[in-house]
């Protein structure tokens, strides 16, 4: 494994600084490459926004994550569980004062306990078939693309740094030296650019392919809400 190259790092820093003040020339990426990089740069924010909203939707938050760390075997208590428990408690306490209401409260409590089970199954399914897949995309495919982007920028800086040195060469010997370096840099840049472009294309294709995971989410919602509707219809005698 190559070690840290102080000289290259300094040259890249100097080249970038010169570009910021329009002192040094900068090799432009092809339009397609620039467009792909722009899209990839936005993907983390897009995916993170969806993950955060979905985790909130399925009752995953910082508190529940901490609770899971200490009580992995304990089922999470959902809001549906809490409502079912409240209905059950009031049913028991009001049986004498309101027998008909008490009976219906008991039935409603049972309905909510079954819906709570359906909710837990739904939450778990969404976590494994949607959230985890999005996180995996972030941590593997998108991470690889970001590394490729960094590598491409580094070889681009190396190329432009040596072009600047060639431009400022004072002697024939210096000019010959930097011409050779530039030729080598151009070869490296072309190779890394093609490798990076392949990774960028793959990343955008896989990002678009997350539509499959979105359908998994919608399907899980459909099944959950149908289960809840069925429980309610049974109690209503429909």
From Swiss-Prot:
BAR domain segment(s): 18-238
SMART domains: BAR (SM00721)
PROSITE patterns: BAR (PS51021)
GO cellular-component term (any): cytoplasm
Superkingdom field: Eukaryota
One Pfam family cited in the UniProt record for this chain: BAR
InterPro entries: AH/BAR_dom_sf, BAR_dom
Protein name from the UniProt record: Hydatid disease diagnostic antigen P-29
Organism per entry: Echinococcus granulosus
């Amino acid at each position: 494994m190559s070690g840290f190259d102080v000289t290259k790092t300094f040259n890249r820093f100097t080249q970038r600084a010169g570009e910021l003040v329009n002192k040094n020339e900068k090799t432009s990426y092809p339009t397609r490459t620039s467009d792909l990089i722009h899209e990839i740069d936005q993907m983390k924010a897009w995916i993170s926004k969806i993950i955060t909203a979905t985790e909130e939707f399925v009752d995953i938050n910082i508190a529940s994550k901490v609770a899971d760390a200490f009580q992995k075997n304990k089922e999470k208590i959902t809001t549906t569980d809490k409502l079912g428990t409240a209905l059950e408690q009031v049913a028991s306490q009001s049986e004498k004062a309101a027998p008909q209401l008490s009976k219906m409260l008991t039935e409603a409590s049972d309905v909510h306990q079954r819906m709570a089970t359906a909710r837990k199954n739904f939450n778990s399914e969404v976590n494994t078939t949607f959230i985890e897949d999005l996180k995996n995309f972030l941590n593997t495919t998108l991470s690889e693309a970001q590394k490729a982007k960094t590598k491409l920028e580094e070889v681009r800086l190396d190329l432009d740094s040596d072009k600047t040195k060639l431009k400022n060469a004072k002697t024939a010997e210096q000019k010959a030296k930097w011409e050779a370096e530039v030729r080598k840099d151009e070869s490296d840049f072309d190779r890394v650019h093609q490798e990076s472009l392949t990774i960028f294309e793959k990343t955008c294709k896989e990002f678009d392919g997350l539509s499959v995971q979105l359908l998994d989410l919608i399907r899980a919602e459909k099944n959950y809400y149908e289960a809840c509707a069925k429980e309610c219809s049974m109690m209503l005698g429909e």
